[in-house]
Amino acid sequence: MRTSQYLLSTLKETPADAEVISHQLMLRAGMIRKLASGLYTWLPTGVRVLKKVENIVREEMNNAGAIEVLMPVVQPSELWQESGRWEQYGPELLRIADRGDRPFVLGPTHEEVITDLIRNELNSYKQLPLNFYQIQTKFRDEVRPRFGVMRSREFLMKDAYSFHTSQESLQETYDAMYAAYSKIFSRMGLDFRAVQADTGSIGGSASHEFQVLAQSGEDDVIFSDSSDYAANIEFAEAVAPKEPRAAATQEMTLVDTPNAKTIAELVEQFNLPIEKTVKTLLVKAVEDSASPLVALLVRGDHELNEVKAEKLPQVASPLTFATEEEIRALVNAGPGSLGPVNMPVPVIIDRTVAVMSDFAAGANIDGKHYFGINWDRDVATPEVADIRNVVAGDPSPDGKGTLLIKRGIEVGHIFQLGTKYSEAMKAAVQGEDGRNQILTMGCYGIGVTRVVAAAIEQNFDDRGIVWPDAIAPFQVAILPMNMHKSYRVQELAEKLYAELSAQGIEVLMDDRKERPGVMFADMELIGIPHTIVLGDRNLDNDDIEYKYRRNGEKQLIKTGDIVEYLVKAIKG
């Protein structure tokens, strides 16, 4: 490709509304342009990267035995009503109507469509297992699209759905998808972790997220420093402390704390160690409970894990915190004065709180706290559960090492769905015993457009993008200095362009009448891994300057050796 026949569209300045580095560099490198909130046009450079990501995904899915299909973006509402998600999905589901006023949705996902297809196409257990995938546009009407294509409303996704007659068969495909995803992200040159995850609203029995490690990530990725254990923050278990509860050394005392409405204020004003404080949170109880609320207690320096809390049998789903009015109606005190002593609703405490002694907590009286509280002496030990987020330095749940926490960008997710959709939509085949058998499902997603942004978040410097070789838009940039004035430079540039292209190498030759500084800046911004610079001065010595984008190292290579050198560097 020649720049004179290409839409380069680079920008010198960073657009003001681009918050994260991937969004900034995708705009500056001429990869995308914003059409409307959360909607982007992909320009030629961006499409080249996108297609490389797609091709790697497609190759590994095919290698894993999956079969490619293509389903409509527009889906009839009847399928969503049948699955029960028409009411459940919320405002992210874009609902539309055709000219006959028939309701449809712009698909955010395709579980309903694939399940409808399979129930009409399959009739026997002998046809299973099968795993279907597509690479298709999705639309989710995000309330606040941000970070460019990282959280856009329209995006490209690889979604796969497998069908089985047994849990064992599902597990085999799940393991194959886990391995395929690991190959996909490894081939792309990404530093990632596969982490255990909560199944969330999709449901099912097992789930793993594939997280690309990056400072701009929205997720906390938890992993051991001494083993393969990895999980997301919602799933990671906070191991119970090994140390027994220390004996009481203080009497419980009611203390005036009129200006301490938060743990931070209490600690600062009374010079308390934060590890000796407890915070109390009131949440809605399940319907028909004797009490409308449940009290959840965590140590002052810990955070409640809302996913874990929501799974408690006493707690309503979705997790809903009590309002100040509801709290005052219960204990006649504000949220900053709550504690376990004389709490009139069921109390559940975190494992760490269970081993505390001589601790401080609200007295359920405005402006007052109890200091020196001890379990069993001042208040009975309540039910104990793991309800907090882990923190760095906690012991790993597998007993090997301690936990580290890094930020991650979720680029893939695999689920064992079970029979959630097949039961709702009556997707069944004739089993080996001749009776109808509801199908067991798995689903497996990769955010193709998000992978592009995540790769940039992990691969950039102050000059631009530093693409992993496998997904770079071009492999080699040829920069002929003053080629319009030097026949020798022009002739060699054309010769190398033809020879490299004949080797199947993707080349961008900058044949613009531009200053060398502009040419260098654009190629570094775009992130092409290998650059060769042709200039009369070096050619006097039969030399070509070669530069590797990732480490910035330069070297002179003889003109007769440069093609062989590049072929070896790129193809190995």
From Swiss-Prot:
Keyword Heme assigned: no
Q: Where found?
A: Cytoplasm
Q: Which family does it belong to?
A: Belongs to the class-II aminoacyl-tRNA synthetase family. ProS type 1 subfamily.
Q: Which reactions is this enzyme annotated as catalysing?
A: tRNA(Pro) + L-proline + ATP = L-prolyl-tRNA(Pro) + AMP + diphosphate
Q: Which GO terms describe its biological process?
A: prolyl-tRNA aminoacylation
Q: Which UniProt keywords apply?
A: Aminoacyl-tRNA synthetase, ATP-binding, Cytoplasm, Ligase, Nucleotide-binding, Protein biosynthesis
Using the record, list the residue span of the signal peptide; answer none if the entry has no such feature. Answer: none
- Organism ancestry: Bacteria, Pseudomonadati, Pseudomonadota, Gammaproteobacteria, Enterobacterales
Q: What does the comment on domains in this protein's record state? A: Consists of three domains: the N-terminal catalytic domain, the editing domain and the C-terminal anticodon-binding domain.
Q: What is its EC number?
A: 6.1.1.15
One of the entry's Gene Ontology molecular-function terms is:
aminoacyl-tRNA deacylase activity
How does this polypeptide assemble, per the annotation?
A: Homodimer.
Q: What protein name does the entry list?
A: Proline--tRNA ligase
Keyword check for Nucleotide-binding, yes or no.
Answer: yes
Q: Main location per UniProt?
A: cytoplasm
| Gene Ontology cellular component annotations, sorted alphabetically | cytosol
Q: Which NCBIfam families match?
A: PRK09194.1 (NF006625), proS_fam_II (TIGR00409)
Functionally, this protein is described as follows: Catalyzes the attachment of proline to tRNA(Pro) in a two-step reaction: proline is first activated by ATP to form Pro-AMP and then transferred to the acceptor end of tRNA(Pro). As ProRS can inadvertently accommodate and process non-cognate amino acids such as alanine and cysteine, to avoid such errors it has two additional distinct editing activities against alanine. One activity is designated as 'pretransfer' editing and involves the tRNA(Pro)-independent hydrolysis of activated Ala-AMP.
InterPro entries attached to this UniProt entry = aa-tRNA-synt_IIb, aa-tRNA-synth_II, aa-tRNA-synth_II/BPL/LPL, Anticodon-bd, Anticodon-bd_dom_sf, Pro-tRNA-ligase_IIa, Pro-tRNA-synth_IIa_bac-type, Pro-tRNA-Synthase_IIa_type1
Organism from which the protein derives: Klebsiella pneumoniae subsp. pneumoniae (strain ATCC 700721 / MGH 78578)
